[in-house]
Amino acid sequence: MTKQRIAVFSGPNATIANSPTLVTSNKGRRFDERRLDGRFDHLVAQELYEPVTVRIKRFSAHPLEADAAGVYHEPDRAYDEVELRPEDGPYPLPYVSRRADGSPDGVPFEDEDLEDRSIGYGGRQFYYPDAARLFAEIDRTITGRDEDGSGSALDRRADFDFIRVLPSGGYASRGEVSGRDYFPYKPRAIAHRPRYRDLATATNVVREAMRSGRYAGGIWLEASPTLEETLYWCNLVLDIDISLVGCASQRPHGQLANDGDRNIVDAIDFILSGERLGVVALQDERIFAAREFKKADDRPGNYKVTGGHGGILGSVGPPVTVWYRPAYKHTHTSEVNLRRLPERVAFLDRADDRSPTTIRIKDGERLRPEVIPRVHMVKYGAYMDEDVLDDPDGEVDIMARIARGLEQQSRAIEGAPPFHGFVFEGLSPYAYGSGSQREALKIAAFSGMPVVRVGRADPGGMVPKRGWPHAVTGSNLDANKARMLLMASMLKLGRWPKAKDPRHPTPEECDALYAAVAAYQALFDTH
């Protein structure tokens, strides 16, 4: 039977595609050097240089093997002999490499090297440049066997293409640069996270692969805290009808009790089941809707759903079982997917404009990196008011962002971001804040910058549609998800119409703004 093929995308800061530090084993240390504590030397998956014949002591795989010696062929033989070959794949072996320091023998590699600026924080990487080695080690049972005691848990299920999108590890020797070509979070002193423009790169690469007809589905690997935003963005903008599954891990591959390897196996089973639920996350055997998926803590089992009304769609079982299906628009039904976005978005830049302003957001079917909107989040907390004057100028962060946005819009022809907006996280469920915040965000709205209001932290219900007519109510989305939907909405609808004096809009300018708010609200009510 021909196996189906799955695309495996490498995303940024991905613990699931990381490994523990390669520390020199005791077998690679001189007797006058620091010894690692413990009765056993640690082992690291490595490839053989040449074939070697080894003798394996009989009945040493389990304490009760000898107790059942009668069921073994030739039970009196002391050892089994086997030839190990390089093409077998990696074997767990002592790690004996040493760091060059100018001395004749070098020095052991240590975990502390990652904190030492004088040696370039160790000069090595432990993220995988793509998932190929990760998959090979899972198949080789380096970190555990399948339920039936065998290996090749991935290879038996499907074939794979490994696609570097915004990978966590990179080839510095080939000119790749951290923060531009790849995105690690360790060593922490030189960690980098993706830039806003990189979201367009991810969108284009994943979309082209997933629409190529070559794949049964795709797996996206990313950092556990930010996976939720990428998946919801993909759920909104990818016009696909096959499954994209996000996977993360709380512990690196190869570390004790790693959970990511199992999540990958389960993601493959979900894809091969043929169920199509849009973009989902698969963590700890549960299938999460991208819209409600959220990380709560860095321990296995601590992903949850937001919004207060569901979000776990099913379980991988076995068998894969789907209990609920998303009711909101996603992927091929989304109104903001890439196919439905115009090549040039048209909007009235000012309420009294006679003709629309247009901005090119796509080159053919590819999203332009420079048009990714800049959306900033503002939060309300009790006792934040400075006075009773509701003075917007007291909200210096909001006012500075408005000024920065207007300045960048004036330079959009030079490649500066043309779209800006705000997400306001207020009280639950009303999404209210201080009077000064309200007035500052009103100025933002009449400066052409869409504003969305959401409830605090992990909302348990929808924001009531009352209070601030100059802002969209963000349904039961949390602030991070509302930000992604606002970004996608701006690519479809453009900026809000500016007032000549944003502090004192005319009735006509208010009507123009409220019409724009309504168009945005329709998207937030259905996605």
Feature annotation, model-predicted:
Residues 2-527:
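Active-site histidine-anchored catalytic micro-motif
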